[in-house]
Amino acid sequence: FVNEIEDLSNYTKPVALTFDDCFVYFYNNAYPLLKKYNQKASIYIICNYVNGPNYLTTDQIKEMVDSGLVSVQTHTLSHRELTSLSLEEMEKELVESKKYLDSTYNINVDTICYPIGKYNDTIVNKAKEIYKYGLAMTGGVYNSKKHEFMQIGVWLLISLQIIWNSQMLK
């Protein structure tokens, strides 16, 4: 979980396993490996996609939360690019997705993964009111005192590669 590597001085080469969008392939391929190797990961849920075709179901998410191996965090309500939304729409994406996840899964969401990796000062300032962490899909680590809000760069991996690798490890 991202919150478990907050103090990087405790680690020489920390790794956080994160998965965006809540595709069912995570449950079918990655989750069994997490159980097999007793490893933790965070998934970033697009709330409006839960129970949709090719996406995780509420029951699957509850099972993973209950396992203690999967931390559920938000990827907003609809995965719309936040920088293109009005202030009201952006706030709704941030606030309502947390409310939904917190109440549905009896958790405390503290991390947002910005859709499409795009954010600006307005989005970060609003996110700081709601979340402890903000993640973006970037090419490296973002660690700036400018926002005084922990933001972590996430490297994009191709989903098919993850699935292929999971088959090789079985």
Give the location of each predicted region.
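Histidine-centered catalytic micro-motifs
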Residues: 19, 71-79
